[in-house]
Every structure is written in structure tokens, then in C-alpha cells.
Design a protein with these regions (language model features):
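Glycine-rich beta->alpha junctions and the first turn(s) of the following alpha-helix
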Residues: 1-84, 149, 161, 165, ...
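Active-site beta-strand/loop segments that form the cofactor-binding cradle
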Residues: 6-13, 125-128, 132-133
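Glycine-rich phosphate/cofactor-binding loops in nucleotide/flavin-utilizing enzymes
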Residues: 26, 30, 128-182
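C-terminal helix-coil-helix/basic helical segment that borders enzyme active sites and/or dimer interfaces
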Residues: 52, 56-63, 79-112, 125-130
Length: 182
């Protein structure tokens, strides 16, 4: 997009002149935090709640399927992953609130949360069995919707490159939470 012979009052300028791309990229990070990571945590939590209800009520061989060890393991694994992403989300938001650009941390969280959502919904399909794959239940749609989270706002592979570049520049805070506290 190009503008020629456009005049604006200084009061209409967002940020500093010549710094528009930097401002846009900084804003993108916050958008990724809210649009991808927070949504992934919220959707995964909702899916886990649905799975818990289903596991309590669906009976197989005379018992609720939630009493079966493999179902319990899937529920527990989903809860652990959701909790880890939620804590990482809060930590990253706190860094941004403190004025840190947190570019690498945002990329890490985008990958972590979007891939976590994929694993949680994959387990949900397993818990629901064949019914989870049918269009009669929302799990099938959640499964399709979860896949796009790894693509939009930058693919997981691109965000891994961003993380690695930040680490190569010396941002050990990506993997050393004690370094972040200093």
C-alpha cells in the first residue's frame, strides 16, 4: 500500500514517524497472545469440560468410561497441558505489561498453545470414540477448527525460527525462567 501526497496533522500520527512497521509488529505480538494463545487455552478448557461430562455419563461395560484408566490418563494429560499453557500465557502477558517486547516468548506461546489445543481435541475424539468424528457432536468441528490455529498468525515452523533467532541473540529467558526474573 502506498500513499502519495498525503498530509496529516501530527496529532494523527500513531507512534513516531518511520516506526510504523515496528509498531505493527509489536501489536501483532499482543494479537497473537489474545487471538491464538488465549483462545486455544479457552477452547481446550471447554473441550476438556465436555470430555469430563461425557466420561462421567457415557457408560460402557456397566461403568462410566471415566472409570477406565486410559480415559483417566487422557483427561489428566489434557488438564496438565492446559494448565501449563495457561501459566505460560499469564507469564507472557505479565512480561508485556511490564514493558517487555517478549517477541520470542509470544512465538513460543503461540506454538505451545496451538499445538496443545490440537492434542487436547485429538484426545477428545478418542474419548468420544466414533461419535467424536460424527457431525452430530461439536467435537468433530473443534477437531477441524483446532488445526487452523497452527497455521494462522504464522505457522508453528515460522515461530520456531523466531524463537531460535531470539535464543541465538542471547535471549535465554525463553528457556530459563530464572533469567527472566533478573
Amino acid at each position: 500500500m502506498q500513499f502519495e501526497n498525503v498530509e496529516l496533522d501530527e496529532g494523527c500520527l500513531l507512534g513516531q514517524e518511520g516506526q510504523g512497521l515496528k509498531l505493527a509488529l509489536a501489536t501483532l505480538g499482543r494479537v497473537r497472545l489474545a487471538q491464538v494463545a488465549a483462545r486455544a487455552v479457552g477452547k481446550a478448557s471447554m473441550i476438556l469440560d465436555d470430555c469430563l461430562d461425557y466420561a462421567r455419563n457415557r457408560r460402557q461395560f456397566g461403568s462410566a468410561i471415566g472409570e477406565f484408566q486410559l480415559i483417566q490418563q487422557m483427561l489428566a494429560d489434557s488438564a496438565m497441558e492446559i494448565n501449563a499453557c495457561r501459566l505460560a500465557l499469564w507469564q507472557t502477558a505479565s512480561r508485556i505489561d511490564a514493558g517487555d517486547e517478549a517477541r520470542g516468548a509470544i512465538s513460543m506461546l503461540k506454538v505451545q498453545a496451538s499445538e496443545m489445543l490440537g492434542r487436547v481435541v485429538d484426545r477428545a475424539v478418542q474419548i468420544y470414540g466414533g461419535a467424536g468424528y460424527c457431525r452430530d457432536l461439536p467435537i468433530e468441528r473443534y477437531y477441524r477448527d483446532a488445526r487452523i490455529a497452527r497455521i494462522y498468525d504464522g505457522t508453528s515452523e515460522i515461530h520456531r525460527m523466531v524463537m531460535a533467532r531470539q535464543m541465538m541473540k542471547g535471549d535465554v529467558g525463553l528457556f530459563d525462567i530464572y533469567e527472566q526474573a533478573r
